[in-house]
């Protein structure tokens, strides 16, 4: 019911079915990250088909475009990010690269990292902003990791995909271990492990944030995911300035850390309110102080008044 568009001639496939269900599935057996999200389904069939799918996403105004695939060489090894590999895949004037640039100007492209833990570089697509820097504001890469956590947060993770490497500045981790839908029937499910199933969690998270914060554009939502990621289980050695002086630490192994959707939905930094005179004050600072003689009159009179509260990301 939540499929808005299907690219013509798309084959039935267990992998794609599982990925879609992680992003937006809803049944008695499992619930995806954003069960109310609408999906436009495309497929990997060469760069022309990929360009068509990307252009469709742009036409539909999709918040996120999930990509649970990557290029490999003739031996099946990850095609690392490099100008040479970019030229091999895209050549000059390739419609797919143009479609990605156009879509990422407004939406967010999400790519799964390689599942090879031994990779020493990021794949071409996960780290494509290294080649085309204009993509970075609309790009995320997602690795797969199993977290060890308690009520205070994540203590450590077991990385079971490639590290973030060159994609670190726009990389997140999620747990790509899911019981998800398969293509066998409309009641069939199977166990899945891989970065392919971590990426749609981030894409679904962007959809949920779009519902929660309708005034924010997809690039703003992307920044919320990066700024709220749990990076307490490692020592950052690089810092990304998110906005308004707010920085978030990352490193080449874990990127910005583990996806934390709850934190992304809560205020980030200092909640604040703009007063009538234009001054900005912290939300926990007293705005009105009344004497006991007023009783609850001021509280009651202001109970129906709406105020706009922003956080450090506005």
Predicted regions and their residues:
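Extracellular S/T/G-rich loop segment that most often corresponds to the catalytic His/Ser-adjacent loop
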Residues: 1, 128-211, 215
């Amino acid at each position: 019911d939540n499929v808005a568009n299907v690219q013509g001639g798309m084959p039935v496939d267990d992998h794609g079915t599982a990925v879609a269900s992680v992003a937006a599935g809803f049944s008695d057996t499992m619930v995806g990250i954003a069960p109310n999200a609408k999906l436009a389904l495309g497929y990997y069939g060469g760069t022309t088909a990929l360009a068509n799918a990307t252009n469709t996403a742009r036409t539909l105004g999709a918040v996120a475009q999930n990509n649970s695939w990557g290029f490999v060489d003739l031996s099946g090894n990850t095609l690392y990010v490099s100008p040479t590999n970019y030229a091999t895949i895209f050549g000059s004037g390739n419609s797919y690269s143009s479609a990605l640039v156009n879509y990422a100007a407004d939406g967010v492209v999400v790519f799964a990292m390689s599942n090879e833990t031994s990779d020493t570089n990021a794949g071409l697509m996960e780290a494509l902003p290294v080649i085309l820097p204009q993509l970075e504001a609309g790009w995320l890469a997602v690795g797969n990791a199993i977290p060890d956590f308690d009520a205070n947060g994540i203590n450590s993770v077991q990385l079971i995909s490639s590290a973030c490497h060159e994609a670190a500045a726009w990389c997140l981790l999620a747990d790509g271990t899911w019981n998800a839908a398969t293509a066998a029937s409309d009641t069939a499910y199977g166990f899945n492990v891989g970065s392919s199933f971590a990426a749609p969690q981030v894409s679904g998270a962007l959809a949920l944030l779009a519902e929660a914060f309708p005034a924010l554009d997809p690039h703003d939502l992307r920044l919320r995911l990066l700024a709220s990621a749990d990076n307490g289980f490692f020592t950052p050695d690089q810092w990304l300035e998110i906005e308004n002086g707010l920085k978030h630490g990352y490193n080449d192994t874990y990127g910005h850390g583990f996806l934390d959707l709850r934190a992304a939905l809560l205020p980030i930094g200092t909640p604040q309110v703009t007063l009538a005179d234009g001054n900005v004050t912290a939300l926990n600072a007293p705005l009105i102080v009344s004497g006991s003689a007023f009783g609850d009159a001021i509280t009651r009179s202001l109970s129906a008044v709406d105020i706009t509260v922003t956080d450090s990301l506005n």
